[in-house]
């Protein structure tokens, strides 16, 4: 097998045979990459998201690529009733659930004083409320059934350092990370582990267009802040996620592992460099975003 070691699958085939794992926001980007790898390792995979066509297409393509059982479900994690229905459908299909990846997210860059209340709430509702909606719904099932389980949150380093220009996301990710650590302590007695990953720059089509828009020029380029001098590869993030979901990490709980090439060591906040963006550039960006929506 060619390529650098970090671009290759790490865990042995069959690691998740007989287990079912749910990945929220699993139709695109990092969620899809993690889901496909879990399927390759033998997991029954459930991916969910708000866009039915995207989720169903992703489920079909992942199943075709891996030969695994993949269920795609439409679910808005902001709505507890939809979350409960999603888990019920997953149990109906696969019988039991063993892991959850809280990957669904929403984020965009903007000076905080330009944000509307609705814009702020839209991120909090998905990232913080959506994460605890899913975690509590599945955690309660596991506890009631005396079943162990694993939860993995996709976090960020600015959950503890803070960062300008992504304040709704920073607030939400910080709350979700504290929930991981708190529940790791509280639910350990039930055999439930909770951990988090804080990724750095892993290019994806959706997030990259919102967080690294070309309208902002070199101010939005993270490369100059990455000591290792490269972006992350999806496979190395998927390797870490699979490890934390597997029994190979059975003594790890309440942890948040950073995988960012050392970026956060060069200053708190991934987006604080946007301090150099002018008001006119922000105006141009907001105008471009409005044109894309229209």
Language model regions located:
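C-terminal helical subdomain
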Residues: 6, 196, 216-252, 257-261, ...
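Active-site helix of classical SDR
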Residues: 135, 172, 180
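Residue(s) in the substrate-gating loop at a strand-loop-helix junction
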Residues: 156
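Substrate-binding pocket helix/loop in short-chain dehydrogenase/reductase
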Residues: 111-112, 116-124, 222
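Short, small/polar-rich loop/turn modules that mediate ligand/substrate recognition or access, typified
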Residues: 101, 188, 193, 252-254
């Amino acid at each position: 097998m060619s390529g650098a070691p970090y671009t290759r699958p790490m865990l042995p085939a069959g690691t998740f045979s007989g287990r079912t794992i749910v990945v929220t926001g699993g139709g695109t980007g990092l969620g899809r990459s993690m889901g496909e790898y879990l399927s390759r390792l033998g997991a029954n995979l459930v991916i969910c998201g708000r866009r039915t066509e995207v989720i169903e297409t992703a489920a079909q393509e992942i199943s075709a690529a891996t030969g695994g059982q993949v269920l795609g479900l439409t679910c808005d994690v902001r709505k507890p009733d939809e979350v409960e229905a999603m888990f019920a459908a997953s149990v109906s299909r696969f019988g039991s659930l063993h892991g959850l990846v809280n990957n669904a997210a929403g984020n965009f860059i903007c000076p905080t004083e330009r944000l509307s209340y609705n814009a702020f709430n839209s991120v909090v509702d998905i990232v913080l409320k959506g994460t605890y909606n899913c975690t509590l719904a599945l955690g309660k099932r596991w506890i009631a059934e005396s079943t162990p389980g694993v939860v993995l949150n996709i976090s960020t380093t600015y959950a503890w350092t803070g960062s300008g220009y992504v304040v709704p996301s920073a607030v939400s990710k910080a709350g979700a990370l504290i929930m991981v650590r708190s529940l790791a302590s509280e639910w350990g007695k039930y055999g439930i582990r909770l951990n988090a990953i804080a990724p750095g720059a892993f290019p994806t089509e959706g997030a990259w267009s919102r967080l690294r828009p070309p309208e902002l020029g070199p101010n939005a380029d993270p490369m100059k802040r990455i000591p290792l001098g490269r972006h992350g590869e999806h496979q190395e993030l998927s390797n870490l996620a699979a490890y934390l979901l597997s029994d190979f990490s059975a003594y790890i709980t309440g942890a948040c592992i950073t995988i960012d090439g050392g970026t956060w060591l060069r200053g708190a906040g991934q987006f604080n460099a946007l301090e150099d963006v002018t008001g006119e550039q922000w105006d141009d960006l907001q105008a471009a975003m409005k044109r894309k929506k229209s």
